[in-house]
Every structure is written in C-alpha cells, then in structure tokens.
Amino acid sequence: MIDKSAFIHPTAIVEDGAVIGANAHIGPFCIVGPQVEIGEGTVLKSHVVVNGQTKIGRDNEIYQFASIGEVNQDLKYAGEPTRVEIGDRNRIRESVTIHRGTVQGGGLTKVGSDNLLMINAHVAHDCTVGNRCILANNATLAGHVSVDDFAIIGGMTAVHQFCIIGAHVMVGGCSGVAQDVPPYVIAQGNHATPFGVNIEGLKRRGFSREGLVAIRNAYKLLYRSGKTLDEAKLEIAELAEKHPEVKAFTEFFERSTRGPIR
C-alpha cells in the first residue's frame, strides 16, 4: 500500500506488497521490496535498495547506494525469514549496509532512533544499535554486536562479533575492538584499550559533577586499583547503590560475555 501523499520517482521500483507511509519520498532508481514498510516522512534519496522483511520508521534520511535488509554474510544462513527494524529520524549516509538477522541470533538486526551512520558503515546480522549513536565512515560491526545509546565509533574501526559497546563510549578511529567496552569509557587502538572516561561527552549530556566523580571512581576501581576483576565488580556494585550513574557498569557486567577491555 502506498499512501497517496507519498512521492515515488518514475524510475524507482516499489514492488507489490510494500507499505509506503504518508509524505515518504522514494527517489530515482531506488528499489523497495515487497515485504518492506517505510514510515511517514522517510526519504530515500536515490539508488537505495531496501529488501527483505524490513521496517523503517518515520523521518529518516537514507542516502544513495545504501543497502538495507539484504541477505546477511553468515555462511549458516539458509534463507530463513529474518528481519531488520530501523527507528525514527536516523541519517543513513552513502553506501551504508545493514543486513538482516539470523535464526541463531534471534532473527533481528535493529537500529534505534536519532543515529548517524556515516559513509560505508556496516551493521552486520543480529546487531543492535541504540539511540543517538554515531558510526563514523567505514566503521564495521560484526555479527551480534550491541552498541548502546550515545556511543560513538570512530572511522575505520572494526568491532568483533558479540562485543558490547557501552553507553556514552567513544572508540577512536582505526581501532580493533575484540572485547566489551564498559560504559562511559574512551577506547583506542588495536586491540582497543581504555584511555579514561569520556568526560567531555558526559558534560555535554548534562551529567552532574557528583555523577562524573562517581563514574571516575568506578573507572579507577576497574582499571587503576590493581584489584582483580571480581574484586572491582563488588566495589563498583557498592558504589552503584549510592550513585545511579554507576549502575550502568553493573548492568554492563551482567551482559558481558567477552569481558571488558583491559
């Protein structure tokens, strides 16, 4: 179903069954598959391909040569009906690729809202990208990666399968991330190692001075105290009882399967 207020360029191909919302814009030479749903006000600039069971929210801008919902690159994939979901107000720049999920990984690749995915960024099968994240040019997420809210991943950086990039993290460019990055941390290098707390980013987002001190103390317990990981976890949990900002660390530890970068 195509809303009567939507614009479809004469050279675009919108297959029967696709749902195009009000005031959406499908530019020249775009291809929209039969199981695709595109929300109100979303713009496909030109030469964009959206395939598979893909749902895109409202007011997104998707630039030329982006490919969304295509078959993933997992050799085990056998054509199962897996999905991509994208939220609202994202800017998805030229040649970005977002692949559908796998049955083994839950069947869903998900991108939240208000994100910026720069040129050539890749979001592999079963990844989850939160809200207000930035993936810079050529940033690459392998399968099953989680990127939490407000994280920034620098250009040419690769993230290993199943890694977690915590909330408010900044990963420097040309890095290789092979373990989980705790929230609020700056990481850099190959293999990526911690370089302190993302203080400037947290200040811009309105964190209080007291909260910043607590986050720094949690960071010091994890990386500067000489304690074992288990010992640091216990003391960080005690700190989190007094400072809600530190709870992000304890929640991260519960999710982490690859262990924090060291």
UniProtKB/Swiss-Prot annotation:
Query: Keyword Acyltransferase, does the record have it?
Result: yes
List, in alphabetical order, the GO biological process terms annotated in this UniProt record.
lipid A biosynthetic process
Q: List the Pfam families.
A: Acetyltransf_11, Hexapep
What Gene3D superfamilies does UniProt report for this protein, alphabetically? Hexapeptide repeat proteins (2.160.10.10), Udp N-acetylglucosamine O-acyltransferase, C-terminal domain (1.20.1180.10)
Gene Ontology molecular function: any one: acyl-[acyl-carrier-protein]-UDP-N-acetylglucosamine O-acyltransferase activity
Recorded GO cellular component terms are: cytoplasm; membrane
Q: Where in the cell is it found?
A: Cytoplasm
Q: What is its main location?
A: cytoplasm
Tell me its EC number(s), please. Answer: 2.3.1.129
Catalyzed chemical reaction(s)? a (3R)-hydroxyacyl-[ACP] + UDP-N-acetyl-alpha-D-glucosamine = a UDP-3-O-[(3R)-3-hydroxyacyl]-N-acetyl-alpha-D-glucosamine + holo-[ACP]
Q: Which InterPro entries match?
A: Acetyltransf_C, Acetyltransf_C_sf, Hexapep, Hexapep_transf_CS, Lipid_A_LpxA, Trimer_LpxA-like_sf
Q: Give the pathway annotation.
A: Glycolipid biosynthesis; lipid IV(A) biosynthesis; lipid IV(A) from (3R)-3-hydroxytetradecanoyl-[acyl-carrier-protein] and UDP-N-acetyl-alpha-D-glucosamine: step 1/6
Keywords assigned by UniProt, alphabetized: Acyltransferase, Cytoplasm, Lipid A biosynthesis, Lipid biosynthesis, Lipid metabolism, Repeat, Transferase
Q: Spell out the disulfide connections.
A: none
Q: Does the keyword Endoplasmic reticulum apply?
A: no
How this chain assembles, per its entry, is:
Homotrimer.
Fetch the PANTHER family from UniProt.
Answer: ACYL-[ACYL-CARRIER-PROTEIN]--UDP-N-ACETYLGLUCOSAMINE O-ACYLTRANSFERASE, ACYL-[ACYL-CARRIER-PROTEIN]--UDP-N-ACETYLGLUCOSAMINE O-ACYLTRANSFERASE, MITOCHONDRIAL-RELATED
**Tell me, what does this protein do in biology?**
Involved in the biosynthesis of lipid A, a phosphorylated glycolipid that anchors the lipopolysaccharide to the outer membrane of the cell.
Q: Which family does it belong to?
A: Belongs to the transferase hexapeptide repeat family. LpxA subfamily.
The name this protein carries in UniProt is: Acyl-[acyl-carrier-protein]--UDP-N-acetylglucosamine O-acyltransferase
